[in-house]
């Protein structure tokens, strides 16, 4: 028997309804902030991602060669594709551009709880605004989006400028190596690279930077950072809106294109793999032939959000099973259609079962049975049976629809 590929999942109807509900809440949050949804291809030219992240990322991707000999890949993330789309088709649009997306991505890595080879992301990209207000808006939207899902989380907000200021004067390669270890929270690796580069004097200020809990403490450690005014303005805006966050200047987002503000979100009820949000400011469009436009965005790991939320009861919409005699099938289709046109879910028998078997089946899948025997067909009525209480009454079709609709979603 064939099985699904490793690292992928099947979703049965109940789980899909839960996922669609949370997905809809995320989309609604972005819409309220003026963000409009975009969509990019599932596969892109391999170069799109190696230009941004280097050749090393290839081993983590699903790479293939098409029939024309072009190197292609299933997208491992969406930001690069959105900025490629901006360069191709969006440069002339009035800025700032407020875009959002919900998409599946693919990475060839070891599956574990909350981490799959096919996974979904909800994300936002704000393109063309280079201000503290833009940074604050994206962070506040990330906070609003996560809150809309019901997940409980901690929000950490930092900025790369103080850390880069401490590392200024170092070779760019050394800076990247140090920030990579900081990003992974690999203390042993960090100590080794600092010792190997004769940079052990940086260990104490780098550690102190990660312990700072106020903006003023940050500048006591890092010194006079040119971006100080913008950092202070951004944090002041967050505090003015009572955003619940923790200043964290130890964040060292490993992707080279992050330039300033960075932030992360962590689900409170997950274990080691608890990061559900990552974002920051970046400049990426110039890599793809566009202008050097400032951008700020985030991505939410949808699958980990769902793991964090866990199972929950869905609002139940009543379902009607239409039961009929063989002679009443045409009337049954009319009745089912009338329920559907009124916004009520209705199912007609497709298996040519007897009426008793139809009622038994409806009791497993529906809340009401609309019974059409010979008398009901001749009178133009239905006998509506509540399959939970057992109560039943012959009614006009309009009355039956109104009775079911009265129960609504519960």
From Swiss-Prot:
Its EC number is 6.1.1.21. It comes from the Archaea. This is Histidine--tRNA ligase. One of its GO terms (biological process) is histidyl-tRNA aminoacylation. GO terms for cellular component: cytoplasm. Its main location: cytoplasm. HAMAP family: His_tRNA_synth (MF_00127).
């Amino acid at each position: 028997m064939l099985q699904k590929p490793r690292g992928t999942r099947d979703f049965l109807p109940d789980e899909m309804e839960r996922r669609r509900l949370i997905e809809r809440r995320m989309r609604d949050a972005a819409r309220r902030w003026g963000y409009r949804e975009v969509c990019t291809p599932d596969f892109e030219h391999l170069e799109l991602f190696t230009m941004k992240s280097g050749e090393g990322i290839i081993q983590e991707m699903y790479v293939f060669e098409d029939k024309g000999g072009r190197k292609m890949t299933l997208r491992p993330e969406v930001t690069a594709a959105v900025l490629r789309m901006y360069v191709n088709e969006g440069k002339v649009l009035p800025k700032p551009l407020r875009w959002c997306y919900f998409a599946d991505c693919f990475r060839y890595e070891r599956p574990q709880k909350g981490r799959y080879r096919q996974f979904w992301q909800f994300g936002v990209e704000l393109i063309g605004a280079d201000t503290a207000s833009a940074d604050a808006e994206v962070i506040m939207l990330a906070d609003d989006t996560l809150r809309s899902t019901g997940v409980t989380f901690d929000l950490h907000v930092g900025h790369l400028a103080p850390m880069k200021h401490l590392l200024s004067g170092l070779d760019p390669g050394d800076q990247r190596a140090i920030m990579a270890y900081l990003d992974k929270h690999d203390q042993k690796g960090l100590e080794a690279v600092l010792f190997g580069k004769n940079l052990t004097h940086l260990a104490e200020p780098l550690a102190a930077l990660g312990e700072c809990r106020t903006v003023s403490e940050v500048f006591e450690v890092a010194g006079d950072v040119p971006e100080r005014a913008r950092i202070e303005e951004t944090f002041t805006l967050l505090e003015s809106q009572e955003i619940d966050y923790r200043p964290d200047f130890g964040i060292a987002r490993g992707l080279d294109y992050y330039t300033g503000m960075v932030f992360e979100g962590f689900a409170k009820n997950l274990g080691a793999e608890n990061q559900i949000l990552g974002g920051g400011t970046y400049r990426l469009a110039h890599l793809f032939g566009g202008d050097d436009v400032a951008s700020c965005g985030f991505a939410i790991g949808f699958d980990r959000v769902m793991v964090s939320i866990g199972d929950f009861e869905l609002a139940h919409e009543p379902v009607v099973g239409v039961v009929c005699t063989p002679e009443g099938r045409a009337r049954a289709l009319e009745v089912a259609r009338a329920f559907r046109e009124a916004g009520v879910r209705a199912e007609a028998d497709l298996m040519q079962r007897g009426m008793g078997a139809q009622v038994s089946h409806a009791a497993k899948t529906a809340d009401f049975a609309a019974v059409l025997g010979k008398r009901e067909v001749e009178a133009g009525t239905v006998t509506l049976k509540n399959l939970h209480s057992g109560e039943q009454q012959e009614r006009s079709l309009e009355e039956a629809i109104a009775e079911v609709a009265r129960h609504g979603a519960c």
